[in-house]
Structure formats: structure tokens, C-alpha cells
Regions:
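Catalytic loop of short-chain dehydrogenase/reductase
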Residues: 136-159, 164-173, 185-186
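A short, exposed helix-loop element centered on a Lys and neighboring polar residues
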Residues: 120-121, 165
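Conserved glycine-rich cofactor-binding loop
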Residues: 9, 14-17
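Substrate-binding pocket helix/loop in short-chain dehydrogenase/reductase
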Residues: 96-98, 104-109, 135, 213-214
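Short C-terminal tail/terminal secondary-structure segment
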Residues: 145, 233, 244-259
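Short, small/polar-rich loop/turn modules that mediate ligand/substrate recognition or access, typified
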Residues: 172, 177, 243-245
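Alpha-helical segment proximal to the catalytic Tyr-Lys
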Residues: 125, 169-170, 241
Length: 259
């Protein structure tokens, strides 16, 4: 299927590795000029070169911390009028409610609510004027199925979901869509961190922890980053112009609810 994306431009946040990188790769394969971002300049440069080699696409790398105004400004200077914005950022680590102080809450909200909101605010006006825009937020399965250990992440990402739901209704008539991808148990560095924590708590090997995690997934395995990226590319496509304000779970069928 031709997704109708050739010649479009995209900003993909936090894309030097993991889910962000997979989304950048998927968009580049569709002929999108991508601007990738991360805080590790060396890793980012290597990722940019790999995507160029694989796709032939134009890839611009901007090392910046998107939790700062200066970082966001530098990223937007490299692509001031994107057709596509993929919001992505690492979540805060799991923990206990009683251990999260005021600073921890502010840091979680800055990374997973305010940074993506400020990115959307910067680009959505131009998208509406040009009558094309695709915004995809990579949030978390915890938005629909909260867990006490993931409270910091859940609170911030749920707030982002609520903000974007209202905004999506306002901009839909201008051919601007806003959707959210809700991953769970995707085989990334963050999942390895979770497996290592599980192993340490349970006194088992990391391999055994991975096996336990796989058993908890309806599909019986961890997801692959490229599986989420394929869904992301579709939501950015011309064909997805009537899909907006939605939360798409990428979780191997594990979510037990109806809605």
C-alpha cells in the first residue's frame, strides 16, 4: 500500500533508539524526510547514517533535550513546518507512591506532558494552515490499564491523552489528526530495564524474567519495535485522514477490557 507520504517531512522525538527510531525508519522507508532527535549525539549520528543507508531518505539529526525550551527550539529550527510530529520520550522509572516527592512529579509531568504539549503547540498552527498534519503520541498501555508502580508515567500520559482528545476535535476539519499509540511489552531497552528489575526482585536470571513477561502477554511473546512503527506510519498516512482522537493499543492482545 502506498501511504501517500512521499515528500512529507517529520519530526520524530527521542528517536536515536527504541520505538522512536523504529518510527523514523518506517517513515523514511515511505519517502518522508525525517528529523530525528536524542540527547546522545554520537548514537544519534550513527542512527541517522543507518536510516539514510537503508532508505535513501533525507535524515537530519538534532541532539537536544526536549524537556528544555532551548532543546525544543533547536529541534524546531531544523524543521519549523513539519507535516508529521511523533511525540516520544522515555518514561520515569517505576516506583512506589510514597517515594515520589514534588520534584519527581514535576519531572514526570515535564517529560511526558509538557514537552509533547509544547511541541504540538509549536507546529499545529502551520499544519492547520497547510491543511495537512499528523500527530502521533507514543504513550503507554498504562493509560488504559494503570498500575500503581507506574503512577508517574500514567498520570502524565493520561493528561496528554485528555488534552489531545479535545484538541483533535478542534483541528479535524483542517485535515489534522492526533492519535496515540499505547505500547506494552515491546522489546526495547526500557523493557530490558524492566526485566532486569524483575530479575533482581525475584532472584532469577534476566532470561527467566523475560520468559515470565512473555507468558503474561496474550500473544505469548514480546512485541517488536517495527510492529508499533508500522501502525505509526499508517496513522500518518493519507488513508488515515478519518482516524483521529484514538488510542491504539499495541500490546499483543493483552488488554482485557472491551473499550
Amino acid at each position: 500500500m502506498d501511504l501517500g507520504l512521499t515528500g512529507r517531512t517529520a519530526i520524530v522525538c527521542a528517536s536515536s533508539r527504541g520505538l522512536g527510531r523504529a518510527c523514523a525508519e518506517a517513515l523514511a522507508a515511505e519517502g518522508v524526510a525525517v528529523v530525528i532527535n536524542g540527547r546522545d549525539a554520537d548514537r544519534l549520528a550513527a542512527t541517522a547514517e543507518a536510516i539514510r543507508a537503508a532508505s535513501g531518505a533525507t535524515v537530519t539529526a538534532v541532539a537536544a533535550d526536549l524537556c528544555s525550551e532551548d532543546g525544543r527550539a533547536r529541534l524546531l529550527a531544523a524543521c519549523p513546518a513539519p507535516d508529521i510530529l511523533i511525540n516520544n520520550n522515555g518514561g520515569p522509572p517505576p516506583g512506589r507512591f510514597e517515594d515520589w516527592d514534588h520534584a519527581a512529579w514535576l519531572a514526570g509531568l515535564e517529560a511526558n506532558l509538557l514537552a509533547p504539549v509544547m511541541m504540538i503547540r509549536a507546529v499545529i498552527g502551520g499544519m492547520r494552515e497547510r491543511r495537512f498534519g499528523r500527530i502521533v503520541n507514543i504513550t503507554s498501555a498504562m493509560v488504559k490499564a494503570p498500575h500503581s508502580l507506574m503512577g508517574l508515567s500514567t498520570a502524565a500520559r493520561s493528561a496528554l491523552t485528555a488534552v489531545c482528545k479535545g484538541l483533535s476535535r478542534e483541528v479535524a476539519a483542517d485535515n489534522v489528526t492526533i492519535n496515540n499509540l499505547l505500547p506494552e511489552r515491546i522489546d526495547t531497552d526500557r523493557q530490558r530495564f524492566m526485566a532486569e528489575a524483575r530479575a533482581a526482585m525475584g532472584g532469577i536470571t534476566v532470561e527467566a524474567a523475560y520468559a515470565e513477561i512473555a507468558q503474561s502477554i496474550a500473544a505469548g511473546r514480546l512485541g517488536r519495535p517495527e510492529e508499533l512503527a508500522a501502525a505509526c506510519a499508517y496513522l500518518c498516512s493519507a488513508q488515515a485522514s478519518f482516524v483521529s482522537g484514538q488510542n491504539l493499543s499495541i500490546d499483543g492482545g493483552s488488554y482485557p477490557g472491551v473499550f
